[in-house]
Amino acid sequence: MKKRLYLVIENYNRELESRIYLAIRAAELGWSVVIGNKANIVKQIKNLHSGVFFIKSIGPKNAEIINLLKEYGNKIVAIDEENIVFFGDNHLLTRMDHNCLSQLDSFYCWGQREFEYLERLYPKFKNKFFITGNPRIDILKAPLNKKYIKE
């Protein structure tokens, strides 16, 4: 059976195009991909094959969902969609719940600055941080950006 990737969407206007891009890239690498909103995926968790869940944030509101996904044998990777701007340690501490971070398999950083900042703030979890960029930015670059040049 193919590896399964679940791309969880909370805000279709902001996330759909970048998730489609990720789905295409993952499919090219042999993954089976499911795109859906968080509520529907959670409702169906008992019926889904275990896989890798890509989520957009790990704030305290996501603790229950992350626990549920882990109970069913899934891996969880995350990116913070709003973390492009830093507002200091206190702000980041509200966006990244320590318990959620402890259950993550990987956290994807937009760049070196975020990576170093998180390593300093959460040294215990430094092996979970990876610099990947953000697919929302990737689709704005050539050759994928033709749609956005007109806008």
Predicted features by range, described:
Residues 3-149:
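Active-site and donor-binding regions of nucleotide-sugar-utilizing enzymes
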